[in-house]
């Protein structure tokens, strides 16, 4: 019997195919069974921080999933948004919301090919976490960003310390500027489940 998708299974993912399988099974009910029940506020917070640092479109929403961060950006006045995710099933849900101009099913641990322009902004909410993506993928994001692009990426706080994100950003010192770390709650006050006290670091910077 296939286990019902949940956060613990998501954190335990090991391979790209494991990731695709879990989110294919979860896509239809992801927002009702996870985002709403857990009071998942991280996408909104990442979008707000992106706008606060001066972020504008066109934006690439990395790990867009069902479009929660895209919806938040749209409400904040950002209208030119593309979506990228490993899960085609999750992007099908996002497509139906009519938020995104273009949608790409891609693995960001590999070089990214989208369309023939670079982005003025990149956001990511919930992708840099346990069982998902490590710090090396950040260089692939920089490759599709314009000079001066604003970038806001959430990183699960435990994942940050366990997987060398601070070291990676030191290595990127000549490629980025205005690096800031913002510690935020992943879930809101209405969350009653395990992990309700989990934190994320929203990393903001500009490409030079």
Predicted feature descriptions by range:
Residues 1-29:
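N-terminal, positively charged/glycine-rich alpha-helical extensions of SAM-dependent methyltransferases
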Residues 31-47:
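Conserved SAM-binding loop and adjacent beta-strand
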Residues 60-112:
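Class I SAM-dependent methyltransferase SAM/SAH-binding core
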Residues 120-134:
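A short SAM/SAH-binding and catalytic strip from SAM-dependent methyltransferases
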Residues 136-147:
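A short glycine-rich, Lys/Arg-flanked "PGG" loop and its adjoining helix->strand segment in the class I
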Residues 148-156:
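Conserved beta-strand signature within the Rossmann-like core of class I S-adenosyl-L-methionine
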Residues 163-184:
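Conserved Class I S-adenosyl-L-methionine
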Residues 177-208:
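Class I S-adenosyl-L-methionine
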């Amino acid at each position: 019997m296939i286990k019902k998708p949940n956060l613990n299974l998501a954190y335990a993912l090991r391979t790209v195919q494991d990731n695709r399988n879990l989110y294919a099974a979860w896509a239809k009910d992801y927002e009702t069974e996870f985002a709403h029940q857990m009071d998942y506020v991280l996408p909104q917070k990442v979008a707000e921080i992106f706008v606060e640092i001066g972020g504008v479109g066109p934006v690439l929403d990395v790990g867009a999933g069902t479009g929660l961060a895209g919806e938040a950006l749209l409400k904040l006045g950002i209208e030119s948004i593309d979506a990228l995710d490993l899960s085609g099933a999750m992007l099908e849900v996002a497509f139906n919301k009519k938020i995104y101009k273009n949608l790409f099913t891609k693995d960001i641990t590999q070089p990214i090919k989208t369309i023939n322009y670079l982005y003025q902004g990149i956001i990511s909410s919930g992708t840099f976490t346990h069982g998902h993506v490590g710090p090396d993928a950040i260089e692939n994001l920089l490759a599709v960003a314009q000079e001066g692009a604003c970038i806001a990426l959430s990183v699960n706080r435990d994942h940050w310390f366990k997987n060398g994100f601070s070291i990676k950003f030191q290595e990127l010192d000549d490629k980025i500027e205005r690096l800031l770390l913002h510690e935020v709650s992943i879930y809101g006050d209405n969350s009653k489940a395990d992990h309700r006290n989990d934190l994320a670091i929203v990393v903001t910077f500009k490409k030079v």
